[in-house]
Regions:
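Membrane-integrated ABC transporters
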Residues: 1-72, 76-243, 249, 253, ...
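ABC-type nucleotide-binding domain
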Residues: 2-5, 10-11, 15-18, 24-32, ...
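Short intracellular "coupling" helices and adjacent cytoplasmic loop segments at the cytosolic face
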Residues: 24, 84-91, 98-105, 110, ...
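Generic alpha-helical transmembrane segments of integral inner-membrane proteins
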Residues: 56-67, 244, 248-252, 256, ...
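An intracellular "coupling" helix at the cytosolic face of ABC transporter transmembrane type-1 domains
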Residues: 175, 186, 193, 285-286, ...
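Extended hydrophobic secondary-structure segments
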Residues: 257, 282, 289-318, 340, ...
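Helix-loop-helix
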Residues: 327, 331-348, 352-354, 359, ...
Length: 760
């Protein structure tokens, strides 16, 4: 991947890159890495295996939430249709009816229907009561039987025009009950009338049949003295309570999903950070140079946070949106399929709006992080370089640089935000337009009797839920590209092959050999470098000896000692410690033998005591004090009020350079290793402290091997062997006197630093 660091333009004026050029460059990189980013995101999913149970629970809760969400419009529909329009009476099956009414209804029933009614009703005096244990299927059959019969009874009632016309047609006296006349007719004649009614009912909307039956039942209840208003209120209240219960379940499910999603995403972030940390800790110097420190920090914090946030949202939105959308479509088809074309129009318009906005805004959106990185880079350079900027009076120039980076980011942010501000108003316009269109079409359906008002209201709510599911997925599609980039950057670290690895069959040094170092014809070249930094270096140091390395800047001194702790592997030859090739030992066993003091003293946040104990936490307070005394650190430690418990800030910024070096030396001494390595670790000390330290150190380390890299000859005059490096080659090896006699390079260094009296 072309890392974001690489896309950030250089800060010099000659290499300033315009936003337009940066947009094109990032687009090409984005297209090239989009597939790899998706693959990286999928690879990171393996970290979710630990949370498989939680994920199953999340999916179950989302189904529960969606079920309740999709049930609410249905309850709203029932409150309007049944509770308000039908006075709380759900169908044409009366709970109770008079014997006379049943006899009238049975006129229009066949023998099977009469039998089914008699089986499911019990006569009590002059009324019939519905049994409590009837099945849903039986109730549906009874509803169908009663609906037709009730329509016929209403149609041929004494007050109806149709009933009076039939009486006149049959030549019966005026005032004769039409139903009494029908009861006296032959069964064949009644069945003929019923056949004609069935033909008409086929073309009649179901809602009209239902309304007729419900009206009949309501009239019957009133005749029996039942309070229909109480039935209506009870139905509305019970439906309202069920809706409140559904809303409570939705709330609890949503809270649970959010909580569990945050937990799963948090565990994912924790595991990713741990994996990155363990991977980075296994890096050799070669891998450290591949990734900058700032980049590794960003990858283990911001990038992990980006993936973590998207994963939490993915559980709540990406999984929920399809469940809600598909469920909404099923509910719509069950409600009324004649208006589904409206949903097709709405979804089409939404997709067009999203496509246009993404085409316009996405190229700018994808470079936002790059522009932020560029602003951070400029800010960091300015803040760290303030003394130099002031010294050269370049404040105005740096202000212009910062202003340009800031303006580029601001313009791009404004452009993206302006584009995105159009999304919600357009979506609201589409949603409101869909609502108007549904109401318009639904009004015609209600007028024609093919649909009820409650169904229209439910259809609107289902349509909004389907549209919202598309909006949720759209919102995620904005965040996913950034998460993919973050996942790819994390994956780059995790899949990096570590060049320095322990041998599968490690060799352990003999206890009889300690503190021995041997370079056997060692040559070394940095990865991807054409020339050797070190060539054919050979020497041997035994226990108790002091080996010094000196040479001009860039001669390979630090590189040479970095081969001992195996920060790099040699290109040719071998480095042996205690008679074993360092490549055959485990890194831990090798480094446990070493006490390393780097060129730049590194301290950790904590106290002076914790820093000295860093290599060997179990040492006593007396050993801590002894290490500080040898390192000449007690001079400033004793002046502090808290002495060894004095705080040390991150990086040791609250101590001077010389104090930092002395504490670093004390840390190595406290470890009591077999081999001490000092990489120009006395450079920040004055001559007096340097002399006292070398004297104390020589006494303390007499049983250990000491390797010293130095710039000052005065530091290494007493060394048992001095190795002189010149452009990666050994120009000489021996004591100070031997080198003064036969090594020209050493002589030049000595004459440049020492007076004639000191040389004599």
């Amino acid at each position: 991947m072309e890392q974001i660091e690489k896309t950030v333009p250089a800060c010099s004026d000659k290499k300033t890159v315009s936003v337009k050029e940066l947009t094109y460059e990032f687009e090409q990189t984005y297209i090239k890495n989009k597939k790899r980013g998706n693959q990286a995101m999928i690879k990171l999913m393996k970290y979710l295996k630990k949370s498989a149970g939680y994920i199953v629970l999340i999916i179950a809760l989302l189904f529960l939430q969606a079920y309740c969400d999709l049930s609410l419009p249905d309850y709203t529909s029932k409150i309007i249709n049944v509770g308000i329009q039908q006075k709380g009476i759900e169908d044409s099956v009366p709970d109770k009816l008079r014997d006379s009414t049943l006899q009238n209804l049975q006129i229009f029933m066949d023998e099977d229907q009469k039998k089914e009614v008699s089986q499911n009703y019990t006569q009590k005096d002059d009324t019939w009561v519905l049994n409590d244990d009837i099945s849903k299927e039986t109730r549906e059959n009874l509803n169908e039987d009663f609906s037709k019969a009730m329509m016929m009874v209403s149609a041929f009632s004494e007050d109806s025009e149709q009933g009076q016309a039939m009486v006149a047609q049959m030549g019966l006296p005026e005032g004769t009950d039409p139903l009494t006349a029908l009861a006296q007719m032959p069964e064949e004649a009644v069945q003929q009338i019923m056949s004609q009614v069935d033909e008409k009912l086929k073309d009649m909307p179901e809602s009209i049949v239902t309304q007729a039956g419900v009206s009949f039942v309501a009239s019957e209840y009133e005749a029996l003295g039942k309070d229909v208003d109480a039935i209506q209120m009870r139905y509305i209240l019970m439906s309202g309570i069920r809706m409140l219960a559904m809303a409570l379940v939705i709330m609890l499910a949503a809270i649970s999903v959010t909580f569990i999603s945050a937990r799963v995403a948090g565990r994912l972030g924790h595991d990713l950070r741990n994996s990155i940390y363990r991977k980075v800790m296994s890096f050799s110097s070669r891998e450290y140079h591949k990734f900058s420190t700032a980049s590794l920090i960003t990858r283990s914090t911001n990038d992990v946070q980006q993936v973590q946030q998207v994963m939490a949202m993915m559980f709540r939105i990406v999984l929920y949106a399809p469940i809600l959308g598909i469920g909404g479509v099923i509910k719509v088809l069950n409600t009324d399929s004649s208006m589904t074309w409206i949903l097709g129009v709405a979804v089409g318009l939404i997709l067009i709006v999203i496509f246009v906005l993404f085409q316009v805004a996405m190229p700018k959106f994808t470079i936002l992080q790059t522009l932020i990185d560029r602003l951070n880079l400029v800010s960091r350079e300015i803040l760290t370089g303030i003394p130099v900027i002031r010294a050269f009076s370049r404040e105005k120039h740096e202000e212009e640089r910062f202003e340009k980076a800031n303006l580029d980011l601001t313009k791009t942010n404004l452009f993206v935000n302006r584009c995105m501000t159009f999304m919600m108003p357009l979506m609201m316009l589409i949603m409101n337009g869909v609502s108007v269109l549904i109401i318009y079409s639904g009004a015609h359906a209600v007028d024609n009797g093919t649909m009820q008002v409650g169904n229209v209201m439910a259809f609107i709510q289902y349509a909004m839920q389907i549209i919202m599911s598309f909006l949720m997925i759209t919102a995620m599609s904005i965040m996913l590209p950034r998460a993919n980039v973050a996942a790819l950057r994390i994956d780059e670290v995790l899949k990096t092959e570590v060049s320095i690895q322990d041998s599968e069959t490690p060799v352990h040094p003999s206890e009889s050999v300690k503190g021995e170092i041997e370079f056997d014809h060692v040559s070394f070249a940095y990865p991807e470098a054409g020339e050797n930094v070190l060539t054919d270096i050979s020497f041997k140091a035994k226990k108790g000896q002091t080996i010094a390395v000196i040479g001009s800047t860039g001669s390979g001194k630090s590189t040479l000692i970095n081969l001992i702790p195996r920060y790099y592997d040699v290109t040719k030859g071998s480095v042996k410690v205690d008679g074993v090739d360092v490549r055959d030992m485990t890194q831990k066993e090798l480094r446990d033998k070493l006490g390393y003091v780097p060129q730049k003293g590194v301290l950790f946040s904590g106290t002076i005591d914790s820093n000295i104990r860093y290599g060997k936490p179990e040492i006593t307070d007396a050993q801590v004090k002894e290490a500080a005394e040898v390192a000449q650190a007690t001079e400033f430690i004793d002046t502090k009020p808290e002495k060894y418990k004095s705080p040390v800030s991150q990086g040791g910024t609250n101590v001077s350079g010389g104090q930092k070096q002395r504490l670093s030396i004390a840390r190595a001494i406290a470890k009591d290793p077999e081999i001490f390595i000092f990489d120009d670790s006395f450079s920040a000390l004055d001559f007096k402290t340097d002399s006292q330290l070398r004297k104390a150190l020589k006494e303390y380390t007499k049983d250990a091997t000491t390797v010293i890299v130095a710039q000052r000859i005065s530091t290494i005059l007493g060394a048992d062997q001095i190795i002189v490096l010149d452009d990666g080659h050994m120009a000489g090896i021996g004591t100070h006197k031997e080198l003064m006699a036969n090594c020209e390079v050493y002589q030049q260094i000595a004459r440049s630093q020492l007076s004639e009296e000191e040389l004599a």
